[in-house]
UniProtKB/Swiss-Prot annotation:
Subcellular location: Cell membrane
Organism from which the protein derives: Streptococcus thermophilus (strain ATCC BAA-491 / LMD-9)
Keywords: Cell membrane, Membrane, Transmembrane, Transmembrane helix
Primary localization class, coarse: membrane
Superkingdom of origin: Bacteria
Protein name, as recorded: UPF0397 protein STER_0346
Entry similarity comment: Belongs to the UPF0397 family.
InterPro entries reported in the protein's UniProt record: ECF_substrate-spec-like, UPF0397
GO terms for cellular component: plasma membrane
TM annotation in the entry: 11-31, 45-65, 72-92, 109-129, 147-167
């Protein structure tokens, strides 16, 4: 258990650092303060490989630090939504266990259903309500911004996350594939 805890902490730290760096330097603005951000594909990879705790804290810590550094202001609802997305993807990790060298079509479907659920909770519920509480913005703007971000993140994870997981799975040795000479 102790070894697993160390692994989780190290993966979380590395993941949060990647979240910050990718989020600050690789983003494409699309609406308001919303942009296509590729760090969510990397977060999905870490969530699957290292589990839901790493996925949550990678998104939560990484997003909080990124916003604090980049904007000088932290939108806690969006930070929580990033964490929730990683948590949900990681919770369903057994459905698409890529560590065994396989990432089947059914695994891809489960992965994308899990990320859709995480994004729906995070960006369909948490961000609009949290921003209403924190910033008192108009509901129409909050839901529009959350919808655009959720869809952008879904597409990013569906393409980038699926590709990263497929590449990772192909780099693993499949169970039972080695034979004794």
């Amino acid at each position: 258990m102790k070894n697993n805890s160390i692994r989780t902490v190290v993966a979380t730290g590395i993941g949060a650092a990647l979240f910050i760096i990718i989020g600050m330097f690789v983003n494409i603005p699309i609406f308001g303060n919303t942009s296509i951000q590729l760090q969510y594909a990397v977060q999905a990879l870490f969530s699957v490989i290292f589990g839901p705790i790493t996925g949550f804290f990678m998104g939560f810590i990484g997003h909080a630090l990124k916003d604090g550094i980049q904007y000088g202001n932290i939108s806690w609802a969006w930070v929580l939504a990033s964490g929730i997305t990683g948590l949900v993807i990681g919770l369903f990790g057994k459905k698409y266990d890529v560590t065994m060298g396989k990432f089947s079509v059914m695994s891809m479907i489960w992965f994308n259903l899990a990320q859709a659920l995480g994004l729906l909770i995070g960006y369909g519920v948490v961000t609009p309500i949290g921003d209403k509480i924190q910033f008192a913005q108009a509901w129409s703007y909050l839901y529009a911004q959350s919808f655009v971000a959720g869809v952008a993140n879904f597409i990013t994870i569906a393409i980038g996350g699926t590709l990263l997981l497929a590449i990772y799975a192909s780099s693993r040795t499949q169970s039972g594939s080695l034979t004794k000479d």
